[in-house]
């Protein structure tokens, strides 16, 4: 409503605003929701830092799902001396959440897995992988109808490759 009021104050007609909303296109890799075969995949692979990882975890915690919650993370890069502590802190936050599966790709993300495992307050299955393909294959074995997956990592960790590898068999079978 505030957006319409702002548009109106700028002289934009209601018809123009409706047309703009109708033509809106989601920006790829930024909280992009993909629904297929009864599952939801949130592709938030454009970039990552400690705050955006916390927000992604919050999104996953709050999303309405009938199934399991999968948090698939890559390394948070370019944090300098804060890198290891940031990954350990993320793991602690994951441990206190309602995430069912933590899947990591990369050596720094693996630190988050270690911390999550050490601090888990409920059943948390953890998969640590060196490659995107290994992570995607793990997901293909574990994910079921009703599950929600959120994939996130720094640009340099190329977590979009996990999304592509995971969706590839689905696209070929359709």
What are these regions (language model features)?
Residues 2-174:
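ATP-dependent carboxylate-amine ligase
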